[in-house]
Amino acid sequence: MISLKSIVDKLYNLEDLSYQESYQLFDYFIKGQIELPLQTSILTALKLKKETSIEIASAVEALLDNTKEFPKIKGDLAGIVGTGGDGFNTINISTTAAIVAATAGYKVAKHGGRSVSSKSGSFDLLESFGVNIELAPDQTKQCLELYNLGFLFAPFYSEGFRYIREARAILKTRTIFNILGPLINPARPNKVVIGVYSKDLILPMAKTLVNLGIDRAAVVYGSGLDEVAIHDGTYVAEIQNSQITEYKVSPADFGIDTYAIKDLEGGLPEQNREIIKQILLGKGKEAHNAAVAVNVAMLMKLYDKDDLKQNTQEVLEIIKSGKCFNTLQQVINYSNK
């Protein structure tokens, strides 16, 4: 076993960790074996040094090895998630996109937690709607099979996350756990759209996904946002057959108008709930609908639907039908049986 002191000394010298060192470090983290002051120092050192794809992949393996097992789902399983920490406090686009994608016929396993750095995290929103976020894994699997949608609450699957919550809150900034969050979904989706909070993270995240053996993925950075943008260009690293292809898309590539970031501003969970409810009922603002649609359109590309404009139009029609709220309502009802 590698000593914690030797790992910390390397980080204080801004040296990269080996696979084994990073695995051991995050095993210590998730088992509550690192005291709070040292946790904050380690997370700060990692951030200043900049995390490598090897450090991220080994941390993912350590965290998944300490997570409750989720029953395997037959066929393709999608994930739409952002790292958070982009600082813009937009409405919950990835959560809404997951509900819309499920309505469109894609099985989506949404993994996440309550807010750390924004006003309203994905599971704050879901709780405000009345979703029981602590379903047993077999019940969540059945919900996925019935309604194409399952919510996996991170602290329920990995109780060790309680050991790191305080350090993350104290730091009030994004840390490696923002990067790890999208990668440690216990349902292990094979088709994922992951939004990152920095352009510098696109390639390390993509390389990490290749190292983890993910089938198809798109890592996106939307000019400041951790999702596909409607205010400016979006940088993409797409993964297929372990190959990474980088490109940039604009709102016009999706066939939509360009909007301002302020058009997507969120608020407290109650305010966000009302905004999201209107979108799901087919009564949302054009900017809100567009933001959700382009993210689902990018997911559809991972299913060999390459025409982003056509994908976006299909999704907008589904949104405007109001059927998406029915999907959420079915999940709410099922989760409270």
Swiss-Prot record:
Gene Ontology CC annotations of this record: cytosol
This enzyme's EC code(s): 2.4.2.18
Membrane-crossing segments per the record: none
Pathway the protein contributes to: Amino-acid biosynthesis; L-tryptophan biosynthesis; L-tryptophan from chorismate: step 2/5
This protein's record includes keyword Transferase: yes
Residues annotated as binding anthranilate 1: 82
Residues reported in the UniProt entry to bind anthranilate 2: 168
Residue positions binding 5-phospho-alpha-D-ribose 1-diphosphate: 82, 85-86, 90, 92-95, 110-118, 122
Enzyme class, first EC level, given as a word: transferase
Entry keyword set: Amino-acid biosynthesis, Aromatic amino acid biosynthesis, Glycosyltransferase, Magnesium, Metal-binding, Transferase, Tryptophan biosynthesis
Residue positions binding Mg(2+) 1: 94, 227
Catalytic activity: N-(5-phospho-beta-D-ribosyl)anthranilate + diphosphate = 5-phospho-alpha-D-ribose 1-diphosphate + anthranilate
UniProt remark on cofactor binding: Binds 2 magnesium ions per monomer.
Gene Ontology terms: biological process: L-tryptophan biosynthetic process
Coiled coil: none
Taxonomy, superkingdom: Bacteria
Cited SUPFAM superfamilies: Nucleoside phosphorylase/phosphoribosyltransferase catalytic domain, Nucleoside phosphorylase/phosphoribosyltransferase N-terminal domain
Record GO terms (molecular function): anthranilate phosphoribosyltransferase activity; magnesium ion binding
Subunit description: Homodimer.
UniProt function note: Catalyzes the transfer of the phosphoribosyl group of 5-phosphorylribose-1-pyrophosphate (PRPP) to anthranilate to yield N-(5'-phosphoribosyl)-anthranilate (PRA).
Record-linked NCBIfam families: trpD (TIGR01245)
HAMAP family listed in its UniProt record: TrpD (MF_00211)
Family designation: Belongs to the anthranilate phosphoribosyltransferase family.
Protein name (database record): Anthranilate phosphoribosyltransferase
Organism encoding this protein: Francisella tularensis subsp. novicida (strain U112)
Lineage start: Bacteria, Pseudomonadati, Pseudomonadota, Gammaproteobacteria, Thiotrichales
UniProt gene name: trpD
